[in-house]
Amino acid sequence: MKKQIEQLSAYEPGLSPRALKENYGIKGELHKLASNENLYGPSPKVKEAIQAHLDELQYYPETGSPLIKEAISKHLNIDPARILFGAGLDEVILMISRAVLTPGDKIVTSEMTFGQYYHNAIVESANVVQVPLQNGEFDLDGILSEIDNDTKLVWLCNPNNPTGRYFTHDALRNFLERVPSHIPVIVDEAYVEFATAKDFPDTLALQQEFENAFLLRTFSKAYGLAGMRIGYVIAAKEAIEKYNIIRPPFNVGRLSEYAALAALEDQEYLASIRERNAEEREKFFELSQSDHFYPSQTNFVFVKTDKPHELYEALLNVGCITREFPNGVRITIGFPEQNAKMREVLAQFTL
């Protein structure tokens, strides 16, 4: 066993509704609003596509996910040779880390961001520098100051999970202009389809200028396919060729690929999800306590409080399972009736 693994722990997704009911003696229904899932689910076309291909379960998928790769290349107008798929972004992050990092290498990222950047770097015996957030947002200047000759990867999450904040197009361009061109800057845009800010980065456009700007996207969030595990990286061809060596041969399942194809095709449904989410998100910021919320461009709201466990339990008492952090609670935006219950709790809670 690698010694460095001893300093890590397995991912803990939080207690299930069943376990929470037992622990807290809750009798009524519990709603899972802890994992930033799209509770509306995927497009109806996805279910039709899955049903249409159920007779293929005995076959391995086509290696490399060629159908969805071609569809994404047309949708985003990019060369398919610049795309690599994984079983969710977790696997994509693992493949990149495994392909690039050697013992003693360094990654630079932020504190309080998606934990798999750190986790996979430690597995590869790399050193991790985590720059503190500035009011919930990535400190790009602080990250830049930590980049040196040992730095092999820079991880950015935009919008950031768990805070929901984002950096602008101009901020990202300015950052990329100052990062040495041989160091990959990987921008994780798992929640990009929820973003409505006009100055949100067009990272695809910036890739035309900066070959070291890599982009991660997923079907798990706005597309509603978290259970199907499919995400991808867009990067320079040379990098994709190297990462592809690490990719397991049949990593994305047949049904996952068909589901993603159907979801991508139904952009009208995706737009309706974005609109509903933005409408419900805005209602949280109409509360008088909204100065305790980080501005969000995602399908969740981070509530800052020095009483996170008390707030978590108060929300649990109205049937809403959220995610507790040391300095606050992350609330997934759910259906209107669930959101209304949570806003009522927040309105009465002393943050």
Swiss-Prot record:
Pathway: Amino-acid biosynthesis; L-histidine biosynthesis; L-histidine from 5-phospho-alpha-D-ribose 1-diphosphate: step 7/9. InterPro entries: Aminotrans_II_pyridoxalP_BS, Aminotransferase_I/II_large, HisP_aminotrans, HistidinolP_aminotransfase, PyrdxlP-dep_Trfase, PyrdxlP-dep_Trfase_major, PyrdxlP-dep_Trfase_small. Keywords: Amino-acid biosynthesis, Aminotransferase, Histidine biosynthesis, Pyridoxal phosphate, Transferase. Pfam families: Aminotran_1_2. It is an enzyme of class 2 (transferase). It catalyses: L-histidinol phosphate + 2-oxoglutarate = 3-(imidazol-4-yl)-2-oxopropyl phosphate + L-glutamate. GO terms for biological process: L-histidine biosynthetic process. Its cofactor is pyridoxal 5'-phosphate. One of its GO terms (molecular function) is pyridoxal phosphate binding. Its EC number is 2.6.1.9. It comes from the Bacteria. This is Histidinol-phosphate aminotransferase. The modification N6-(pyridoxal phosphate)lysine is found at residue 221. Homodimer. Belongs to the class-II pyridoxal-phosphate-dependent aminotransferase family. Histidinol-phosphate aminotransferase subfamily.
